[in-house]
Amino acid sequence: MKNLALPRALPLTTGCNQLINWGISFYMPGTFARAITADSGWSSPAIYSGLTLAMLVMAALSPFVANLLARMGGQRVVMIGSLLISASCGVMAYAHSLVTWYAAWIVAGIGMRLSLYDALFAALVTLYGQQAQRTISRVTLAGGLASVVFWPLGDALLTIMSWRSALLVYALFGLLSAALTLSIPHHTRPTGRKPAPPTGGQDRRNGWLYATFIALITFVSNGTSTHLPEFIASVGLPVTVGMLWGMGQTGARFLEVVAGAGLTPLRLTLLTALAMPACFLLGLSSTLLLWSAAGFVLGYGAINGLVTIVKATLPLQLFAPEEYARRTGVLLIPAQVMAAASPLAYAWLNRAAGVIGGMWVSWGLTLVIAGLAVAIVKGQASQSEAGIPALSD
């Protein structure tokens, strides 16, 4: 299939779509949970369990997204997902029982899997092939501002209206987000199913390495970010230091965009993975040097920002573009399960071993992550030396 020309406005419109979708779904409980608890009497864990349920729904749907993209086209899939997130906000606004609350999060989970990064990036790669790589970087730059925009916006809404009314405002934002997907060209593949191409030993190895690598990174990143306030409090710093996380995340993505084609997916993967153990050692040294805690928050925020780009662009180096949606749909399932499990796992770990003990466990996992990154890069180098054509520039 010949790739389409890339519209200039597409990074802006899809970036705004992602900023809204993340802001009104994933980041929503962080703003509204306290107000919901005060009004409904539901516990904070019960409220956040809705988000965990949504993540599990995302994992369950993952294998089917590639077929949906092929049959319906990326524009329709991402638009439907955005509308479902909008609808879920509307249902939550009228929820008076946890059953309704969880039902709304199931709807949100379906919408999130159809319209957040993974589905959008698969749609862009299907349409534009290797051209999509720079657009993906720009979209993550905009999407990374979701918490910066929607946390203060949610707080401001709560000063003038109830959380239920605020969720209805979020639902309207969801409708705007759905309208932005009209900038994505409508394109579908022929509905006749072709058998998946046979996978060789190197291809299977790439798949296992990628799935394990992203799953472990997701586990550490989600667990660390969820319990970041505990770490900051444990070293005696004000919670406002957590703002450095967002600054690091946005700054790193901006620098990646500026670096351009010189920073290939393989180089970015290696740089990100090798920086992780060093960053956690910086955090562990905070028991002796207080300033290093702030350095850890800033540094790991930067790493977390790059991880999203690595997850999206590395498959372009490992697999053919036409296989991107199908392969990532399956290979990202472990990561999505880890995303759902990591907050609870880290809560248990911090209780059992303390915050610093949990940091040591994370540091050990980052060594494994770094080793996997080296294996991926070496595997691609060996493939090139063997004369196998590269899949990307």
Residue spans of the language-model regions?
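A late C-terminal transmembrane helix in Major Facilitator Superfamily
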Residues: 147, 318-353
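Conserved MFS/SLC helix-loop-helix module at the cytosolic interface between two early adjacent transmembrane helices
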Residues: 60-98
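Symmetry-related core transmembrane helices of the 12-TM Major Facilitator Superfamily/SLC fold
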Residues: 165-183, 358-375
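Extracytoplasmic gate region of multi-pass secondary transporters
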Residues: 29-34, 203-257
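C-terminal transmembrane helical hairpin of 12-TM major facilitator-type secondary transporters
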Residues: 246-248, 263-314
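Extracytoplasmic
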Residues: 9-44, 61-65, 151, 224-229
